[in-house]
């Protein structure tokens, strides 16, 4: 299982999400001025996602879940335990 976390510069909720999730995670900075990020920013706007991070959870390249903002319940569902298993 792995995650992609789309974050904004200096976002503490984004850093905390990555830290607590504790699975293989790719962090991707999103900046409204940076054109390569435009598809993600437009996706978030279309789906009324107004707060970073945008978190996508994958299992074998299949999207399993997605959310935005800091969501402790979602993090707890997918975080890796010390023995390497997810909850």
Language model region names:
Residues 28-30:
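Gly/Gly-Pro-rich "capping" loops immediately C-terminal to redox-active cysteine motifs
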């Amino acid at each position: 299982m792995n995650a992609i976390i789309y974050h904004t510069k200096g976002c503490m909720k984004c850093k905390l999400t990555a830290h607590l999730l504790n699975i293989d995670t790719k962090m991707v900075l999103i900046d409204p001025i940076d054109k390569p990020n435009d598809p993600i920013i437009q996706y978030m706007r279309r789906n009324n996602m107004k707060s970073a991070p945008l978190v996508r959870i994958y299992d074998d390249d299949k999207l399993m879940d997605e959310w935005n903002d800091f969501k402790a319940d979602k993090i707890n569902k997918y975080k890796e335990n010390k023995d390497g298993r997810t909850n």
